[in-house]
């Protein structure tokens, strides 16, 4: 169903909807949004950057003024908006742009100020990974008045290809603690500052990453029993690429429920929907050389802003410099491959699975991914699989449920309450 566009660019409109969609959880103010949108030119990364940097500085100033006056909630809200606006201000740049890291650090700094003003405790966690690398996240804990019976259920919330742990707060990090859940907003390899600053790429076998995270929480629960984390009620969640990661993580038996929002089945198959089929088949079969593919894609990207941006993110996320190498690496990001077999047959926990019923307007489609995944979750009983395929934008018809996060959160926690036997009184 048609909706009002904020920009003549579909990509810009999608990302603007993403920003405005965080308003219900404190990530945006309508007046600030309108002011920024009026200054953004189609496919102009500089005007996008300037508009959101201006709003970030404005919100940061408001937050500092409120903090100096002792106004906790206004200060918290403005720091949250500043964090989101500084994140947005760097978004249309490629990761090689020198301004990306400083803007990202400013986003993190503002979120850190907001974190100290939350109703419940928000802990910055550092999780030991491989080769001396540390994964970071924000553990958002419920305030006392929001506690449910028993220990706190825990959600491991993984980002996708372009989210940050600070932006993740605006979905489950905001709603979960209000409903008694502890929520970890996590940046894994190839995400956030690990990609932008440390140049560490994504890895397809996210169950390995999840294993380190679960081990960390096992130790944390022992060293901090006062946190009352329930390791028998751990869920994993993610959207788009994060939805793929959630399904991979759900192969770990310690995960008791999975929320996969609009995941892809295969990154390679998804890429094929965005390129000339015949040309890609010729390349895959060796009839087109790598240098020809690279030249073709480079030329296409020079004349298409969205394609150029996506290609740049794809190459940096995969840790490669050439389009051909990126596409080959995409084949590893699949829920079925030669190395790991049929991954979905190792998932046994309940799964809440969603798709964009509007079709593949951005990165996935219900037919190519969601329904295929549903059918291949053979070890999950039918009554433990819940599917949601909205089509209208207001209902979550856009990829990753952009613009409908409050509704997504409601449906997610209805599902998790059912699986974790959380009892509540009707209002």
Curated annotation (Swiss-Prot):
Output the Gene Ontology terms for molecular function: hydrolase activity
What GO biological process terms are annotated to this protein in UniProt? Answer: antibiotic biosynthetic process; monocarboxylic acid biosynthetic process
SUPFAM superfamilies found in the cross-reference section: alpha/beta-Hydrolases (SSF53474)
Q: Which domain of life is it from?
A: Eukaryota
Q: Which UniProt keywords apply?
A: Hydrolase, Virulence
Q: What EC number is given for this enzyme?
A: 3.7.1.-
Q: Where are the transmembrane segments?
A: none
Q: Which InterPro entries match?
A: AB_hydrolase_fold (IPR029058), FrsA-like (IPR010520), FrsA_esterase (IPR050261)
Q: Which Gene3D superfamilies does this entry report, sorted A to Z? A: acylaminoacyl peptidase (1.20.1440.110), alpha/beta hydrolase (3.40.50.1820)
Catalytic positions are 368
Q: In which pathway does it act?
A: Mycotoxin biosynthesis
Family label: Belongs to the AB hydrolase superfamily.
Quaternary structure, from the entry: Homodimer.
Role according to the record = Alpha/beta hydrolase; part of the gene cluster that mediates the biosynthesis of GKK1032, fungal natural products containing a macrocyclic para-cyclophane connected to a decahydrofluorene ring system that show potent antitumor activities. Within the pathway, gkaG catalyzes the Knoevenagel condensation that affords the 3-pyrrolin-2-one ring, using as substrate the polyketide-tyrosyl acyl thioester product of gkaA.
Q: Which protein is depicted?
A: Alpha/beta hydrolase gkaG
Species source reads Penicillium citrinum
Ranked from the top, the taxonomy reads:
Eukaryota, Fungi, Dikarya, Ascomycota, Pezizomycotina
Name of the gene: gkaG
């Amino acid at each position: 169903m048609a909706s009002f566009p904020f920009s003549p660019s579909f990509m810009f409109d999608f990302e603007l909807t993403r920003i405005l969609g965080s308003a219900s959880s404190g990530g945006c103010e309508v007046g600030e949004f309108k002011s920024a949108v009026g200054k953004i030119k189609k496919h102009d990364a500089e005007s996008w950057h300037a508009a959101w940097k201006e709003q970030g500085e404005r919100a940061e100033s408001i937050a500092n003024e409120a903090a100096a006056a002792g106004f906790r909630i206004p200060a918290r809200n403005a720091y949250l908006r500043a964090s989101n606006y500084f994140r947005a201000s760097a978004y249309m740049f490629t990761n090689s742009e020198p301004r990306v890291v400083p803007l990202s650090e400013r986003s993190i700094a503002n979120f850190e100020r907001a974190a100290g003003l939350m109703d419940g405790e928000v802990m910055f966690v550092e999780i030991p990974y491989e080769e001396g690398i540390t994964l970071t996240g924000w553990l958002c804990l419920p305030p006392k008045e929001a506690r449910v019976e028993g220990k706190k259920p825990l959600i491991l919330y993984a980002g996708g290809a372009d989210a940050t742990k600070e932006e993740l707060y605006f979905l489950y990090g905001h709603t979960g603690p209000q409903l008694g859940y502890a929520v970890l907003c996590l940046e894994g390899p190839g995400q956030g500052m690990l990609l932008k600053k440390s140049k560490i790429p994504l890895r397809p076998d996210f169950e390995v990453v999840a294993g380190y995270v679960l081990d960390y929480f096992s130790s944390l629960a022992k060293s901090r029993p006062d946190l009352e984390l329930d390791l028998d009620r751990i869920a994993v969640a993610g959207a788009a690429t994060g939805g793929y990661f959630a399904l991979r993580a759900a192969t770990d038996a310690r995960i008791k429920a999975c929320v996969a929002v609009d995941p892809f089945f295969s990154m390679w198959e998804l890429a094929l929907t965005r390129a000339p089929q015949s040309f890609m088949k010729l390349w895959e079969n060796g009839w087109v050389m790598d240098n020809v593919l690279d030249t073709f894609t480079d030329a296409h990207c020079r004349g298409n802003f969205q394609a150029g941006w996506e290609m740049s993110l794809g190459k940096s996320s995969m840790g490669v410099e050439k389009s051909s190498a990126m596409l080959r690496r995409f084949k590893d990001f699949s829920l079925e491959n030669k190395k790991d077999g049929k991954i979905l047959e190792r998932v046994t926990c309940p799964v809440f699975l969603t798709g964009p019923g509007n079709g593949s307007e951005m990165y996935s489609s219900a037919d190519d991914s969601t329904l295929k995944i549903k059918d291949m979750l053979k070890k999950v009983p039918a009554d433990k699989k819940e599917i949601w395929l909205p089509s209208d934008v207001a209902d979550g018809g856009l990829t990753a449920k952009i613009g409908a996060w409050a509704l997504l959160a409601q449906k997610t926690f209805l599902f998790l309450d059912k699986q974790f036997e959380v009892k509540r009184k009707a209002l």
